[in-house]
């Protein structure tokens, strides 16, 4: 019996006080397990159960849990399955920076960078409407809705409206259907019933070059990009951005995602090489040159730095 049902029975006088205490205690014990995880996880401070939702508080940000998803950002941070890259990212961001968070999801990276760089200008882009509302909700929760400019849109090699495939776990939304059926399952919120879902929706997209021109962006220092395989198309729409503004880029590149778009991640490396960039992985807070991805590659996140513009950063963090 669920705790809420038990509560209703007690309120209706159908369960005695002592039986209610006993059964309620059994259902509240998992809170102690959550407390133990928080104690072990140095990044997490507490979990707050509120009237308007459940909130994870970290050292610097707050995120709503979304248990309608079978996995959510707050959850992965709490249980410690997601590494914390924001601190290292921050070292490549100068004072007064302009930052693009492409594929912002519910705002974990945007919020982390906003707290670390209070004098920055941050643009957060999320094309899926439901996820975008989660982004706005978390920005308001942290009081960062003015600092972080949220845009309901994505980027591609062309402008227009494109079809996105959105599984039940909408963080895996993509311009090509995913093949991992784990993300199809809806969050059961403890109800014990999981259904598969994959929807097709239309979302607005633009090119990097067009957006920068239309919004008169004169400076761009850092781009974080996570678009579930569309990274090559995102970057190919920013030729002038990478030739002229030359931001540091931190991006996900996975062979399995790229394959759904009929390209190999090495094509991204070649493209950036043509713009004067080098590709790097990171280890022990150092940049490691990375030339070519093959079947033995285990890294999934990569930095691109321009050889001339970012010479000082390369000297400081190069291996």
Give the role of each language-model region.
Residues 1-128, 133-206, 215-217, ...:
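S-adenosyl-L-methionine
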Residues 52-53, 117-124, 207-319:
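Conserved acidic-Pro-Pro-aromatic motif
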Residues 69, 104-106, 129, 155-157, ...:
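Short, glycine/acidic-enriched loop or turn micro-motifs at the edges of active sites
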Residues 77-98, 178-245, 257-260:
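Short internal loop-to-helix segment that lines adenine-nucleotide cofactor pockets
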Residues 113, 135, 164, 234-238:
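Hydrophobic packing residues within well-ordered alpha-helices of enzyme cores
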Residues 131, 171, 230-234:
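Short phosphate-engaging motifs
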